[in-house]
Structure formats: C-alpha cells, structure tokens
Design a protein with these regions (language model features):
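Positively charged, small/polar-rich N-terminal and surface patches that mediate targeting and assembly
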Residues: 1-97
Length: 97
C-alpha cells in the first residue's frame, strides 16, 4: 500500500481530480481545500498580500495506482509549468499486527 500526497495550487485542482478519477475510477481519497503554505516560489495564504491557496489530496492506494498517479501528475506539471505542483509517495502499512 502506498500513501500518495499531492499539494498543489488550487487553480489545477479540477484538472488533477478529473484525470485521476478518469484513470482510476474506484480511487478513494481525502481532499483538503484552502491549504496555506510556502513553497519555493511564493506563499499561499489566501489573504490580500498572498491571495492564492493550495489544495491537498491524500490517498492510500495500490502501487499500480500510485504509478498511474505519478504519470498523471507529470502530465499536469508539463501542462502547468508555472504552478506550484508537488506529489509524494510513502510506503504504508495496512495494519500493525
């Protein structure tokens, strides 16, 4: 099992979700909109000085699905090269015995 975490500018949220859901129809995820933070280029605070915000998507999924998500995110990154788009993968345990 793999934990997938995507943190990205909210401007690409719809594109990310549309592609992931079309390629992995049974995907389960948690979406956190309105995420504040600071990346390499800018802050995202949702205020008058730094008006943009991020979103965060977390999913626990198979290695096969994680590879699909990696491919999708590479495509999104090429389509939107100036947006802050990051994604991470961590091996996860289903249960502790």
């Amino acid at each position: 099992m793999i934990r997938v975490e995507i943190i990205s500018n909210q401007s690409v949220q719809e594109d990310v979700l549309e592609l992931i859901e079309s390629q992995i129809p049974d995907i389960e995820y948690t979406l956190t909109p309105g995420v504040q933070g600071k990346g390499l280029k800018t802050k995202k605070s949702g205020d008058t000085i730094w008006p943009e915000l991020n979103f965060r998507l977390v999913s626990y999924t198979s290695e096969e699905n994680a590879k699909k998500i990696d491919t999708i995110m590479k495509l999104i990154k090429t389509q939107f090269p100036d947006e802050g788009i990051s994604w991470y993968f961590v091996k996860a345990l289903d249960r502790l015995e």
